[in-house]
Each structure stands twice: as C-alpha cells, then as structure tokens.
Amino acid sequence: AIEKAVDALEPDLILCHHLYLLTAMARERFKEQKIYGFCHNTDLRQMKKTGLWRDYIREQIRGLDAIFVPQSAQKEGVMEIFGIGAGKIRILGMGYSQEIFCGPEKPDNAARGKDGAIRLIYAGKIAEKKGVKSLIKSLSYLPYPRDGLKLSLAGGAGNKTEYQEIEELALKAPYPVEFLGKLPQPELAKEYQRSDIFVLPSFFDGLPLTVIEAIACGDKVVVTDLPGIQDWLKEQAPGAVVKYVPLPVMRNTDEAVSESLPAFEKQLAAKIEECAREEGQRRVDLSHLSWKNICKEILKSS
C-alpha cells in the first residue's frame, strides 16, 4: 500500500508517525526519499518494553532525515533509545483543531449548567493505566454533597474485562459517573464546554493532546506530573489553570505499584478540590498550536 501511494503521488516528503516498525520499513524501502518521523511517546514505551525487531528499528530510525517530538522529555528519550544526535531532533509540540476546540460563543450561557454541580470530565481510553480506576476511587475523598459533582468519561474500552471493572467501580462511586463512549471531535468539544475541570490521571503519556483541547474549550485542568509537561505548558499555555499530581511509584515504564495508589488517589482528590476553588479558566491563546502553524513549522525544516 505504501509503495502504491509513493508511486502514484511521487511525494517530495514522506511524513511517518510513530518511531516504530512501519516507519523503519518505510526508511529501508525508500532510501532516496526525504522522510520525517514523528514521536508520540508510546513508541518509546514500545522500544523499552518489547524486543520485537528492536535493533532493526533502531538502525532504520537513525536514518530518518529529521525527527519531531512533542517536548524535551521525548527528545531525551529519542536520543537515549535510538542513539540519535540532538541536531536531528526538533521539538514541535502538539497540534489541535482550533476550529473545533474553542470556548462556547457565550461563555456565561447555560453550557456549564445552572445546578451548581462541579463537572469533571476525562477523555481517553477507559483503562487502568490511564488512571481511570484511580480517578473514580479519588471521588471518595471529595467533600461535596452527592448532587454537588458529576464525572463524565469519554472514550472507548481498551480491555473489556477492565472496562467492566471500571463500570462496577463507577456504580459504587459517591457521585454520578457517566460513560459517554467514544465521541466525534465536535461532540467531545461540546462536552469540554459543558465541564469545569478536565482530569487526566494517566500513568504514562507524552504530551497529551486532550489537555490542550480542554484548555482551549475553557476547562481548568488536573493532570499527573508527566515528564516535561509542567515546563511545556508554562511556556505554551501561560496563565492556564493547571494543577499537577505527583505520579505514583512506577515499574515497567507504565505500571503503577498498587501499594502507592491510595496516597496517589488522595493527592488527586486534593488537586481536584484545589482546582475547583479557582476561578474559571482564563482565556488562553493557543493559536500557535493550531495544525496550520504546526504544519508551517514542519515545512520550515524541509
């Protein structure tokens, strides 16, 4: 399929997402083509955890003409895992759809409800490693009356058994938990606009695009203190209301040590409560992170 596309389009530049097997195969097959690779952090996790063709992938990725990473933590990871010099790696950030993810036309309208309840939202895979179980458990540490808070979970199931366990946890939660399923982007944007706080308690992530989308829609944010995320958000989204939760004790890159989770969940609840006391999210200019501007940055390197 790739060969057919290259033969038909005769591209000047090939963009390959994910520094893993398919990108490595493209580099080997199209030796004369200029190829840029894009790191999404999960590729670094795969290289650490999986031995599948690791040496082959490492060799071919080194041959890419340029590599783009979300932020400095991934740059360091690419240098370490692939043995690539800093000069070939460019920090790009993340692009989001500015036309879809934006504040409501009337910020003071009923989009966020008039019942006085604090609306929390999570978006992503409904999975334990994304911290969803811990998010639901953290609700038990919050001080509000039952009708004072609501949690919405947007996203599809990763593992069916795990999803069922999360559903069972939600039934026991002290506040209503709504499963929205996997939403098209315009619908997800509306849910952000109806919410007050976006919570991402993920145990492993690069630069989560959902954080940017939520800020663009006017949400305050509670997120785990992922490597490099504080510095990046302070630079790219100055003034945004963001609270950071220290990660639990980790092993094997993305697995939380179970004994450390109760303390993590208490800290998560404390940050949600702290965030709720803050005034509403300030308008933050994220136009420099639009796909149009991201594309301009990529083409500058060609």
Question: Model-predicted segments: where are they?
Answer:
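Aromatic "clamp/platform" in nucleotide-sugar-dependent glycosyltransferases that forms part
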Residues: 203
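A charged, aromatic-enriched C-terminal amphipathic alpha-helix characteristic of glycosyltransferases
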Residues: 256-302
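Short alpha-helical donor nucleotide-sugar binding micro-motif in glycosyltransferases
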Residues: 182-183, 190-195
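Short hydrophobic beta-strand element within catalytic cores of glycosyltransferases
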Residues: 220-223, 230, 234, 240-241
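Acidic anion/phosphate-binding donor-loop and adjacent secondary structure
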Residues: 47-51, 79, 96-117
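Nucleotide-activated donor-binding/catalytic signature segment of Leloir-type glycosyltransferases, i.e.
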Residues: 163-186
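Conserved donor-binding/catalytic core segment of Leloir-type glycosyltransferases
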Residues: 112-130, 136-139, 152
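Carbohydrate-associated surface elements
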Residues: 73, 95
